Amino acid sequence: MGSPFAKKEDRPDINDEQKGMKKKVAIQGIAGSYHDVAAQRYFEGEAVEPVPCDTFREVIEHVSAGTVGMMAIENTIAGSLLQNHELIREGNCRIVGEYKLRIMHSFAALPGTRAEDITEVNSHPIALMQCRDFLDTLPGAKLVECDDTAGSARWVAEKQMHGHGVICARRAAEMYGLEVLAEGVETNKRNYTRFLVIARPDLAEHMQQEAVRNKASLVFALPHTSGSLSKVLTILSFYDMNLSKIQSLPIIGREWEYMFYVNLTFEDYTRYRQALEAIIPLTNDLKTLGEYEQGKQSI
């Protein structure tokens, strides 16, 4: 069964990106968001035009129609975005790359605003949570949750909200004309988000013709037999696969059954393919979500 997200007639030509246009990248949020920052870093040297989306499902819809997507998959503090694993699988998307972005939050407001003038701070709830120690130094400020860090910055700027501060990326503050009052206000300085670059299968093949492949993302179910997961892991170990992540999600409508999302890193692609063949008889619904180069981590 094909992807439920796209109609064939809506799909652009595979060579559209080669005609001198900006590279369009679908992101959750707007320009200046951390998804936008990750896209700009990953495609450094290319002209990137973010395609704003309200939801991650909307990102998948754009990817199914032929646009490259950038999607957060896990954060070192907040953990995994579980629904995004399922969206990638259900949308029949392919992972073609990843980028690990250090999340450095800035505190910004309208130009000329002083920190003591702030009566309300607006941002995404996770950003507010990650800056709690800094926000405690503003005891008179009310914290108000919003859908997007960059959206908060744009709203304060466009509505000229005096007395409002925002937690956002420096890129968002500069883009919308706010003044950065403090930088690096996150409590934990080892705050990273891993973003996946995703594409429609035919575009993924085109993008990866000469790509280095030393990481793979797989998903599979297992039979209800004793030691079924242990057997799979033993085989992966035998073929020198490094299991960098394993995540289980319940299968809706099938009580106590799970899909396992696995990330593997490896040095020998041939050994990886042999490992994949070896676990096929032990798994159900095995699917490769992507084979790609292990991502760099920003400083």
Tell me what each language-model feature is:
Residues 1-299:
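Domain-level signature for soluble enzymes in the chorismate/prephenate branch of the shikimate pathway
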